[in-house]
């Protein structure tokens, strides 16, 4: 099914903020974000599954919450024990009020783990399922996207295989074209406010960023880990939302400079 024409004057690009606490979720809401992805240990591990107590606290903030389901750091190939934990965590997160989950896995030879994916999608039911950045570790992203489409996945979070999504614009545009409105492409991975216009021109449906700043701990000691943690910066969130709205409107109206409102791949160096 192709994406229906957007009847609005502007193309609406959603902004999702990666958060690790309820205060950051409140910041995201106050600054205009559309939803949050909730995880733990983002900077240290790339993100792992948060506690159910934290899920409940963030759900209470009022924004749609999409919970990362990843049992450990260190890649995306999961054994039987980890798969069982992931399925339990999906059910627990949804029972705690999450709007959806963010998860997935790969086979050892670098393809989408379709058996695990089918189980995760089934456990998610009618809630939203986003395939996470494991897609950036596959050998063939377009083939991986086809596997996600076949499994009924609704959204994928990707940098286009680049370290930073802003450097993966051409690949993201290819994914958008391949998806053809059947699945949302959400750009994420090192996203800065300055990169957002180019990402919107690539045709992505949503922008994902942490918009974080460092908070130095008041007191630490042996065994306490790093002496700082990350929280959402309201000014950065607001700037990202404004950039996405402005770029979406300009793409719709064909007002971007240098012909940049046409084919996004034409402007990629």
Regions found by a protein language model. Give the residues of each.
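Glycine/Thr-rich beta-alpha phosphate-binding loop at enzyme active sites
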Residues: 100-112, 134-175, 211-231
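Glycine-rich, proline-tolerant flexible connector loops at the mouths of alpha/beta enzymes
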Residues: 35-57, 71-78, 101-113, 160, ...
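N-terminal amphipathic alpha-helix/helix-capping segment at the start of soluble metabolic enzymes
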Residues: 1-18, 22, 60, 252-254, ...
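Acidic (Asp/Glu)-rich catalytic clusters
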Residues: 29-30, 55-66, 91-96, 120-124, ...
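Active-site mouth loops of central-metabolism enzymes
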Residues: 9-21, 69-85, 130-141
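Alpha-helix-loop-beta-strand connector modules within alpha/beta enzyme cores
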Residues: 47-73, 112-134, 167-192, 228-254
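Catalytic cores of alpha/beta
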Residues: 23-27, 77-92, 136-151, 187, ...
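Hydrophobic faces of well-ordered beta-strands that scaffold small-molecule active sites
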Residues: 13-19, 36-38, 65-69, 101-103, ...
């Amino acid at each position: 099914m192709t994406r229906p024409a957007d009847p609005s004057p502007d193309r609406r690009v959603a902004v999702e903020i990666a958060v690790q606490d309820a205060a950051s979720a409140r910041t995201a809401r106050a600054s205009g974000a559309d939803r949050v992805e909730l995880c733990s240990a983002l900077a240290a591990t790339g993100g792992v599954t948060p506690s159910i107590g934290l899920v409940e606290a963030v759900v209470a903030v009022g924004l749609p919450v999409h919970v990362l389901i990843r049992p450990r750091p260190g890649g995306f190939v999961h054994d039987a024990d980890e798969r069982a934990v992931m399925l339990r965590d999906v059910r627990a997160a949804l029972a705690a009020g999450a709007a959806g989950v963010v998860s997935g896995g790969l086979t050892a030879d670098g393809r989408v783990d379709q058996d695990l994916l089918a189980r995760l999608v089934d456990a998610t039911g009618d809630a939203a399922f986003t395939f996470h950045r494991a897609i950036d570790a596959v050998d063939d992203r377009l083939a991986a996207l086809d596997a996600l489409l076949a499994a009924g996945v609704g959204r994928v979070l990707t940098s286009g295989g680049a370290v930073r999504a802003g450097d993966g614009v051409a690949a993201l545009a290819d994914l958008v074209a391949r998806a053809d409105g059947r699945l949302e492409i959400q750009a994420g991975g090192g996203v800065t406010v300055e990169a957002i216009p180019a990402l919107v021109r690539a045709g992505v449906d949503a922008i994902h960023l942490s918009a974080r700043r460092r908070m130095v701990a008041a007191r630490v000691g042996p065994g306490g880990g790093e002496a700082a943690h990350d929280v959402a910066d309201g000014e950065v969130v607001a700037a990202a939302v404004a950039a996405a709205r402005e770029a979406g409107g300009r793409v719709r109206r064909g007002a971007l400079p240098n012909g940049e409102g046409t084919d996004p791949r034409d402007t990629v160096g």
